[in-house]
Amino acid sequence: FDEKGILQGAYTVHNPDRLNRNVWAWRAMVDAVYSSIIAADLIVIETMQNDGRVITDALDVQIVCGMIIGRAPCEVITYTPRQWKGQTPKAVTIARIKRDLTPAELDRIDKKATHDAYDAIGIGRYHLNKND
């Protein structure tokens, strides 16, 4: 985000080497994200909420988030899903985000963007609105 709205919304391709969980696969994932945060003033990340479930993919995301935070060149703020969207279903969350974006912002979102990309946009918007 900048003063004009969303700069970019994109999807990072799933890394099949992740299944090996070797150090080079994890590094490749962090490097894929790091190049887009190097000039950031602030990073806002969704963290896992503890609701008793253990989801391997969610744990993987937490590991990558931890590595990104470790390399972050700026302040990092985290929110749980409960904090920023409550129990809202994915489809409703995406529809609300799209409804609230300008046509110019919508054009900056990759057409292949998944719910994860829209969650990232939603978390950023939540933080900006909370701190206005």
Over which residues does each language-model region extend?
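Phosphate- and other anionic-substrate recognition elements at nucleic-acid/protein interfaces
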Residues: 1-132
